[in-house]
Amino acid sequence: MTIVSFILFLAFAGALTWFIVRKQDVGSNTGFFLAGRSLTYPLIAASLLLTNLSTEQMVGLNGSAFRQGLCVMAWEVVAVVSLVAMAWFFLPKFLKSGVTTVPEYLELRYGKSTGTIANAIFLFFYVFLLLPLILYTGAVALKQILDFNTLLPGLSDTAILWIAIWLIGLMGCAYSLFGGLRTCAVLDTINGIGLLIGGFMIVFFALSKVSAVNGGELSLMQSLSEVKNAHADMFNTFGRPKSEVPFGTLFTGVLIINMFYWCTNQQIIQRTFGAKGLAEGQKGVLLCGLLKLLGPLYLVLPGMIAFYFACKGLLDLDMNSSALAYGKLVTFVLPNWLAGFFGAVLIGAVLSSFNGALNSSCTLFSIGFYKGLINPQAEDRKVVRSGRIFGFIIAVLCMCGAPLLANTSSIFDYLQKTNGIYNIPLFAIIVVGMLTKFVPKMAANVALFVGVVLIAFLTFGDPELVQKVTGGMNIYHVDTVVFLILVAIMGVWSFVAPRKEAFVQQDAKAVDMTPWKFSWVAGGLLLVLVALIYASFANVSALKDNETEPVPHHWHMIATEIANKEMTALEIDETEQGVIITEIKASIDEFDKSDKKPADTAVTRKIVYQTIGKHYAKAKGISDAHLEAFNKLVEREAAKSAKEADDIKAATEPAIRKFFKAVIEGIEESAETVKKDAEKAADDAKKEGESALDSINNGVEGVSNSVGQALGGAVDSVSQGIQGTLDGVSNTFKDL
């Protein structure tokens, strides 16, 4: 049923798109690259939204929300401010010039060399960063949603990944290279409707599941209140000073990055260049802004609900696997018969992003290099043909290179690190070019070079040297400093050696430049809504929390869940339980404040068991020697679980459980024997390459038999008495 609903939705979207655009002209530059400048505001809004939205947003932003809470909505909500700026200031400038690309505008403003350099920068990062990343993340999502491992048994994960990448890539090529911008825009609109339905559908089923696990009597709003009450500090728009997006960065680097992306990024704003007129473009941009305000509901809230379920032990997630949060939530709450539809919607979003980037790459090459440098007199048919050939070549290269991203430690880190290298310098010269009249092309060229080199050094340079240079400043503040340096360079240059004649922008008469009469009112209302959203969930006190890591309370809650199970099974009295919980939280905080990495799964597990073991050993009179042996074993296994594969981790857990059982019951001789033999069984299993879990279980079983022979019925009695404790420990290790 999943694969059937997937195919049906894609077929419906493709057929409807063909029916709508079947008579369009794609033989001319304007027809192919700008949809004949005929796009209306619904198409522009949907195309902007879908070109932006792909699996790196759906998966990455929800994963960040799982770790950080509501504060990560900044990437969605601050985008609205940028879209208002686009409608009010940037779009009139671009449309008045009649340009097809951003580098073409820079060529008009500064000169041919500046436009060519900008063209090369855009193309380089689209081909080597954006397109492969879209293909890879989309393929991973497609593989999981459609369960390709079951559909294609016998194939390796690598082979399945290649198949998924080429499937998405070839579909994207068909839409982008043969249909042009209008085909992409129509498909984006259809997928956009499906995405909104699918995104809100996930929220509906997730909140319904919250109600189900609480007795099934809660309404949707009551379910949302349950999540909020359980984790109130996650519902804070301001975040903490050490959050991924501290509140202060909303006015510095986060704003600048959003302004570049929504106001000057060719992949995005090419849709607005195809508008019928300025009014249609402004309405489309502002409608997109309104839709972006809904983004946190399906890009942030699901991640927070996933955290709620994880803390309840219903989802196998921790802070190190937050990238899996959205996928696991979808699998957990969505009925099977809807999985195919949602998969098709998600892949539609991927196709929209891929189509947008590929179409923009073709446009940049055809207009900037082929017609601009190689064949200036080329007729439209040849220009379009050159774009299609170039697009096909880079699509094949990207489909071949995308699987290599599987070896990247974090694709989201890869994206964030490389994006700033080109977007800050480009945004600086565009803004200065629009606001000034005398900055010469040499100043812009130097600023581009200095900006790329400087940010590349700050991103990939020696960490100690970068730390000294920046003084530990937040990376988004650093981006702002670089931006201001580049603006200063161009400002000083224009004062010392200005261009001979002031730049005067000419009206190319390409479209009707009559503005939408309600653009200022609509934009103002959007800005008010942004302020209200932030104010509604603001917690100013969190801004003063300088000592705490972004979300140590998450580890507090997870640790408390584990500890409560074990202490209840061990019949520790409530007063002592409170003391132990307080000590566990203090130990986690102390670890976070140290020079080591923040607390993670292994650290939390280790702290919980060592703390309980210490208190229980004292109460039961267990010797210090055996308690020390237990602590060492916990240390060793915690370290191993953080480094080794899951099967080795699972295999070594019975050794801890068996030894923990023996120690807490005071069977000192058997504990020592179990410890040694279980360790030996684990080592042997690892060396021989056998199934580690079976080997250790067999080893532990053999040890238990020998201990039973030595101690008689005593061990059997003890084992039966604490079987519930063992089950709790086992489930905790697996769940965490």
Model feature map: region roles:
Residues 357, 361, 603-604, 655:
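Residue-level detector of well-ordered alpha-helical segments, enriched
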Residues 572, 580-584, 588-601, 630, ...:
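Extended non-catalytic scaffold regions that mediate assembly and binding
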